[in-house]
Amino acid sequence: MAILETRDLKYSYPDGTVALNGINFKAEKGEMIAILGPNGAGKSTTFLHFNGILKPSNGSVILKGEAIKYDNKSLLNVRKTVGIVFQNPDDQLFAPTVEQDVAFGPMNLGLSKEEIEKRVKDSLKAVSMEGFERKPPHHLSGGQKKRIAIAGILAMNPEIIVLDEPTSGLDPMGASQIMKLLYELNRQGITIIISTHDVDLVPIYANKVYLLNEGKIIKGGTPREIFSDSETVRSANLRLPRVAHLIELLDKEDKLGIKMGYTIGEARNNIKEFIKGE
């Protein structure tokens, strides 16, 4: 049984603009999933349905086998299970200090002071931000803010964390650090779902990919299954990972016949095999 899925999910804005048109998505427990698509594809709108921030115009969102209900009590339980980290951490961080910000969610669960303190401590440790408890969030770097936003979600002990463009606005090192953090959280059993248009990150970290364009899922599968269909990827205003594009050119333009690879490590091994075989 999927831990989270949508069935024929449709959503229109109040002015009648169709944002989502029949989204069928499925996440199994423990997966790390990337929803890949260009700007305006509907990725953020899809994510806002995953924990009930938005209510579908038609269709349903199924969490652990049950359709989400939209009364306050039901939504509180949904948001204990599914945590969302917004693209811009400034939309999420509002308390005077890091400690207060991370404690906000657990406080609203009515937990004891001791349990709240434990969750704050454990969450900050998990994102390598111990020692920042008294810092004002607005004094932090972009990468640090992302970590604090993730810590605030971790403090709720979710089973699923959904992150909208988690590497947006970060330099290459900061983006790599955030993705390694998410990979480690996934190894600990948390289901991770990210949206991105960074095609180079996807084959490194994701084990399932959905390609979204114009409010529709146009393809789903493993990274290899997605990127081997270069025509569909490009029809969504995306591209192959750089290393895959290089091998594609070596094959089509230079007739070298090197086996396709979608990460640097995979491509390196394939090029070495090709050289040895000459």
Swiss-Prot record:
Membrane topology field: Peripheral membrane protein
EC numbers for this chain: 7.-.-.-
Keyword list, A-Z: ATP-binding, Cell membrane, Membrane, Nucleotide-binding, Translocase, Transport
SMART domains: AAA
Main localization, broad class: membrane
Similarity remark: Belongs to the ABC transporter superfamily. Energy-coupling factor EcfA family.
Protein's UniProt name: Energy-coupling factor transporter ATP-binding protein EcfA
Phylogenetic placement of the source organism: Archaea, Methanobacteriati, Methanobacteriota, Methanomada group, Methanococci
Gene it is expressed from: ecfA
